[in-house]
């Protein structure tokens, strides 16, 4: 009977080293060992590992969903299928397209040739319900059209209190003030537009949300109160005054709202503002044209140099 025994190591020969094992990429270090751990596993643990390995199944990766064909089609005006459904006020079709495109921000915020998104068109056509579904699906309230108007600008300009309410209710509080203060390419905020059109309910709602009653147009510095005086809208003046505007704020030309009442027919507006305006801003400033005419000499130095001009042999007299 043969017994298993470890083979004897070859005797060391002086001046001769035993051969070293090699591995791919270089020699193995003397103490390098590789232990899978299988030898130290119990029989039951080993069988459990085998069963788990046998249960592994690789599922084939599903191909990415192909976009709907209708989502890629555009008209010559740059309108998508959703733009058209909203323009033609096809409510059921619009809602179905919105449902299928939910979360697709690129499609929902696509701008046509007038830079209008579906949300712009929903507001223009006064479809507040469609606007609400668009916002829930992921439409952006900050996108501007070719005039720089956001959907909220348009809603305020049209006086649609329902659309204004829907748009602002789906806006986070920290973002709402930025939306209210946004100006279009004419420099008008939403409050300016509602004031110009005289929509008192919209004006009051915007002010209740925190719209800046003292916001100035960048072109000439008029506030909503200046605009109300220009429009001779006494009801709007009364509404704005209730919300504590700075009645002494002047335009870039230096005019207070009270000073704009001079020469106007509506005396009640002048009476409302007179008690609130400081005395120095109740008097009209002197015209710059009058001041310049008084200070400038009748002739310039260049004109006085040529005092011997003749036409047709006759000397000109100044």
UniProtKB/Swiss-Prot annotation:
Post-translational modification: Phosphorylated at Ser-36 and Ser-40 by IKKA/CHUK and IKKB/IKBKB; disables inhibition of NF-kappa-B DNA-binding activity. Phosphorylation at positions 36 and 40 is prerequisite to polyubiquitination and subsequent degradation. Monoubiquitinated at Lys-21 following phosphorylation at Ser-36 and Ser-40. The resulting polyubiquitination leads to protein degradation.
Keyword check for Cell membrane: no
Ranges where the record places region Disordered: 1-44
Family matches, as PROSITE patterns: ANK_REP_REGION, ANK_REPEAT
Modified residues (Phosphoserine): 36, 40
UniProt-annotated location(s): Cytoplasm; Nucleus
Record-level GO BP terms: negative regulation of canonical NF-kappaB signal transduction; regulation of fibroblast proliferation
Molecular function (Gene Ontology), one example: NF-kappaB binding
Transmembrane portions of the chain: none
Lineage top rank: taxon: Eukaryota
Tissues with expression: Highly expressed in lymph node, thymus followed by liver, brain, muscle, kidney, gastrointestinal and reproductive tract.
Function field: Inhibits the activity of dimeric NF-kappa-B/REL complexes by trapping REL (RELA/p65 and NFKB1/p50) dimers in the cytoplasm by masking their nuclear localization signals. On cellular stimulation by immune and pro-inflammatory responses, becomes phosphorylated promoting ubiquitination and degradation, enabling the dimeric RELA to translocate to the nucleus and activate transcription.
Residues in ANK repeats: 114-143, 147-176, 186-215, 220-249
Name listed for the protein in its UniProt record: NF-kappa-B inhibitor alpha
GO cellular component labels: cytosol; nucleus
Pfam families: Ank, Ank_2
Sites bearing Phosphotyrosine, chain numbering: 46
UniProt keyword list: ANK repeat, Cytoplasm, Isopeptide bond, Nucleus, Phosphoprotein, Repeat, Ubl conjugation
Provenance organism: Gallus gallus (Chicken)
InterPro entries, sorted: Ankyrin_rpt, Ankyrin_rpt-contain_sf, NF-kappa-B_inhibitor
Ranges of compositional bias, category Basic and acidic residues: 17-44
PANTHER family to which the protein is assigned, alphabetical: NF-KAPPA-B INHIBITOR ALPHA
Similarity field: Belongs to the NF-kappa-B inhibitor family.
Record-listed cross-link Glycyl lysine isopeptide (Lys-Gly) (interchain with G-Cter in ubiquitin), residues: 21
